[in-house]
Amino acid sequence: MAPSKKAGKKVTPASKKSAGQGKVAKADWKEGFKKKQVGVSDMTLLTTISNEGVNENLQKRWTNGEIYTYIGAVLISVNPFRGRSVETLQRYRGKNRLEVPPHVFGIAESAYYNMNAYHENQCVIISGESGAGKTEAAKRIMQYIAVVSGGQDSSIQEIKDMVLATNPLLESFGCAKTLRNNNSSRHGKYLEIMFNGVGEPVGAQITNYLLEKGRVVGQIENERNFHIFYQFTKGASDEQRELFGLQGPEAYAYTSLSNCLEVSDIDDVKDYHDTITAMGVIGLTPDEQNEIFKMLAIVLWLGNVQFEEMDDGNSSITDTGVTDFVGYLMEADSALVQKVLTSRVIETSKGGRRGSVYDVPLNPAQATSGRDALAKAIYNNLFEWIVSRINVSMKTRSAHAQIIGILDIFGFEIFEDNSFEQLCINYVNEKLQQIFIELTLKTEQEEYVREQIKWTPIKYFNNKIVCDLIEERRPPGIFAALNDACATAHADPAAADNSFVQRTAMLSSNAHFEARGSQFLVRHYAGDVMYNVAGMTDKNKDSLIKDLLDLVGSSGNTFLQTLFPDRPDPNSKKRPPTAGDRIKARALVDNLMKAQPSYIRTIKPNQNRSSSEYDVKAILHQIKYLGLNENIRVRRAGFAYRNTFEKMVERFYLLSSHTSYAGEYTWTGDSKSGCEQILKDTGIAKDEWQMGVTKAFIKNPETLFALETMRDKYWHNMAARIQRAFRNYMRYKHECARRIQRFWKNNKEGIAYAQTRDYGHQILAGRKERRRFSLLSYRRFMGDYLDLNGKSSLGEELAGACNIGGESVTFSSRIHLLVSKLGRSSKPSPRFIVVTEKAVHILILSVRDGQTQYNLERRIPLSTIKSIGMSNLRDDWLAKEGDPLISCYFKTELVSNLVKLTRSTVNVVIGPTIEYSKKKDKMAQIKFIKDETVAKDDLYKSHTVHVASGEPPNSVSRPPAKRKPGVVRPITQGKLLKAGGPSDKPKPRSVPKPKPVAQPLPGRDSTTVAPKPAIKPSVTPSSTVGQRPPPAPPRNIAPPPPPAKPETPMYRAKFAFEGQEGEMSLKKDDVVELVEKDDNGWWLVKMDGVEGWAPNNYLELVPPKAVSAPPPPPRSRPAPTTTPKISLTSVVADASSKPVSVFPGMQPSNGSATPWKKPLTADTTPASSRPSSAIGSKPPPPVAAKPKPPVIPVKPSVSAKGPAKPPIPTAPRPPAASTSRSSKPATAVGQVDLAAAVSLFVTHSRELLLMM
């Protein structure tokens, strides 16, 4: 039934024309069922602005598959590391960014729309570190523009095809596999697409920036050369192999020395055919393609030219057959090739006249350098030629009106050894950051001025001072100093480097520069980078020697000569351009400043290319140096939200009775007055919003949230009736979900603990016997046992002694260090060990002037630890290469932490002996032998450790204990389902038949077995066992006097001590009883019935007091008349019997309990174990073991692809921890079967639907 019209309210017919009425459609009730938003899609609406808040919001969205987020008009993209559907492309066509979720298509649509609407050039700047998804974002933008730009003309479609074909072609020649990215762009490119007046592409142009040509001749371990070399050597035809003498990539030095020929997600043969296809689309002729591959063959064979040193120190070619083939490919004389590669012609001049000519032979190192220089020059010039040839094919067919530029450039780089390449890359990124800051603030300010909005200008850091430091000519910057050094000492690279070092000293007045000898530091926006001067001037010159240019000039191959068109004039006094001059950053900046920018900031979620791992720490660092927090603050400095009057009214007209009725738009005035009416009717304060010329501005995000909440409630109220009809179903659904969640929560932690525990098994790799308590099912790895990361006094003192600053402590514990003293044998001495992210700290406790203090005895950087030695027995000793030999209860956990922190570079050596450096240049050896007489831990004496046999090396952790089954409540219990559904009566539980237990009769020996009582199966067994016991002996007899207590030494605490688990916390002047002394400085004491360990230097002896007379015995009472109950495990004692304690796991034998004859020792019960007593008198508490707090493991990340390929080992080492299926631990007992739970939920859901 349709709702009736409100009295006195007249609805304007749709046919009548009114201001803005015809453009607003009736509100749709389906909006109330839209998918709930995860986080906020525009981070200018964050309630709390901080780097952590930005990180948390990005993590929420990325975890739920939302990889895109806005900061105003800036798009943040977090690489998902998985393929995504492109079916959403049409959703963004003709829509503004507020109408659809954030996406790279939204940025492309905005740029294309603004170009057509405002007739302004646009550019999209994509930035981020390597592997963050810059190239993929650029592909999506080109794909979107090709689809939406229209045009049916064949020439327009040809331009679109060529623009898309540039991607596989330039990726093959300009991308390579690195440690961080399998398809890393090793060059920067700026693609400009030209459009005519109606928005159709009529041409394009690509500008190349700084190809990493050094990769051609060398790569680090597990990286590859450019893709095209592997595609060519694997996918070439038989004709090409015959023509170029081509073999596999393993046959060439330039492609095989890095030991990475295959990549899991790259098909080189398929990519080779795609490259050939792209060449055809671009318009490269077969002859041009043949010449390109011939140049690649020349580069590959040049790498195989090897040199050997002769007796006079000069070089000679090892295999002249290789140079003969190089001469054949270059169409040059092979003898000239050999001569140019092994010697150099030097010409002297005097007074401007030509002097003598000398033929100087080269040593092998110089010859190798010349060979590599020629190979790099050929490939670099070939890449430049390909880019130029693409531009020729894509040149404009007609006059163009506007341009859309797409910048895909290398990200900021910081390595251990940074040289000239990193300086150039970081300089370009510094310039882009400057553009980002200036244009963002400029656009913001212009909008406020244009809309006549009052606001306060924002102060920000201008990194122009860093750009001037690098590029300025007067006063000279870094590039100018490099050019001057190359000009003054051009003949000697070492002298040129020294000249550059002297010139950089003049730059020290800049606060962002710091000279440090042969290195210098630049404080970039993304962090401080230390650059190495060695080789910088030589790389900056970037020119071939005259001999190599003459070799190219003598070639009969015209294509090869075309690659080297510019040859320096020897008589010219003009300095040739250097590599720094060729960066062309100024030209790039000029092009970008002429266009209206759109920004895409890409973020890399992890270094493992995993689609499920979100590295919070790494992403937080990227958020900081990308300046996302500052960008949000700039956007929110004036007003957090703005929109046109028309869009504002269309969004919120439901909130005012003056603008809507029953979902119909009824406002007859203009849009601006409609906005004001809505804001007034919703009670928004006047200082929270302003009206501009064309837009409404809202100051705080909370105001916008309030408007959105009121709008959502409108539809919620309308949907309340529908919700009632589904109430029973929703309750049932939620109950199923809660049960599944409850089951999962109860078991997921156990899985994480098992995975962390198994990591230690993988490191030991079945090479070491294990202690029994190391194989507990849920032994937790806490790590920081001394609480350095907490607020305990001990942790604070140790942290202060270590001076760790802001470093995070991953492991800390008490240990014993083997200390050698003069004239005496070595002896274990108590110490403290603290492991941080950077180093291992060993501390000692000492007493001075009656005060205890902790002193740092040694600090070992993690980078210096090469190996760890352990025995193959169950002892706790281990030795790190570089002196210390320690004994640690948590040895497996310590080794696991060191392996993780060093990324598996530490070698774990396990054997019957440990060899360590006792003193400088003096090695010592410690032996480990089995000795079953050692009852507790191990015994060290004279470089020999005696230890009892442990669990077998291949032992695995014990399965978790089974839980006691509880009462299962049916899911249909209560009002979840209506009558007629599944029965809610629980099934009757069967009563197990009790087992008869022998009962000792009173007055007889405890070993006598009583007859079995007759017990009915249906009756619960009674403790009386059917017989009436004799009455208890009379209790009115006075007890005998207690025996005299032995004199126990008592000690008083001199200082307060805050103990951990297993330790006794003491206050000053507390009196404790001494139970056991240990020679390691810790005593076992007892106070108020509780035992624990305390340091002996905190205690002082209390003089014994006089023993007082015992108190009189209590009055006797008559014995009770009731019969005492006898349980199945209790013992009826006579007058001479003593109470017996029954511990868990101990069962009575022959009807009687075995007395506990000796106290429980530390080698049979862990410190955390607290056995409870069964029926009978309470025994004295067992002796507490030395402190061993439980460990809380860090949850291991789950990798879908298994562990990464480890580096080639130099010595035996344990396999890296893996969470792949092959190494997944067995399912714990009691683990929830989620598949069964979900199946049960689906079954009940079907039953419910059938009932309804």
Curated annotation (Swiss-Prot):
The keyword Nucleotide-binding applies. It comes from the Eukaryota. Residues 1194-1203, 1216-1228 have a biased composition (Low complexity). Residues 770-953 form the TH1 domain. One of its GO terms (biological process) is actin cortical patch localization. Residues 716-736, 737-762 form the IQ domain. Keywords: Actin-binding, ATP-binding, Cytoplasm, Cytoskeleton, Hydrolase, Motor protein, Myosin, Nucleotide-binding, Phosphoprotein, Repeat, SH3 domain. Residues 38-712 form the Myosin motor domain. Type-I myosin implicated in the organization of the actin cytoskeleton. Required for proper actin cytoskeleton polarization. At the cell cortex, assembles in patch-like structures together with proteins from the actin-polymerizing machinery and promotes actin assembly. Functions as actin nucleation-promoting factor (NPF) for the Arp2/3 complex. The myosin motor domain displays actin-stimulated ATPase activity and generates a mechanochemical force. The tail domain participates in molecular interactions that specify the role of the motor domain. It is composed of several tail homology (TH) domains, namely a putative phospholipid-binding myosin tail domain (also named TH1), an Ala- and Pro-rich domain (TH2), followed by an SH3 domain and a C-terminal acidic domain (TH3). Residues 1162-1175 have a biased composition (Polar residues). Pfam families: Myosin_head, Myosin_TH1, SH3_2. Disulfide bonds: none annotated. This is Myosin-1. The lineage of its organism: Eukaryota, Fungi, Dikarya, Basidiomycota, Agaricomycotina. InterPro entries: Fungal_myosin-I_SH3, Kinesin_motor_dom_sf, Myosin_head_motor_dom-like, Myosin_TH1, MYSc_Myo1, P-loop_NTPase, SH3-like_dom_sf, SH3_domain. Belongs to the TRAFAC class myosin-kinesin ATPase superfamily. Myosin family. It is found in: Cytoplasm, Cytoskeleton, Actin patch. The modification Phosphoserine is found at residue 356. Residues 989-999, 1028-1046, 1178-1193, 1204-1215 have a biased composition (Pro residues). ATP binds at residues 128-135. Residues 403-485 are annotated as: Actin-binding. Phosphorylation of the TEDS site (Ser-356) is required for the polarization of the actin cytoskeleton. Phosphorylation probably activates the myosin-I ATPase activity. Residues 1-27, 945-1049, 1103-1228 are annotated as: Disordered. One of its GO terms (cellular component) is cell tip. The keyword Iron does not apply.
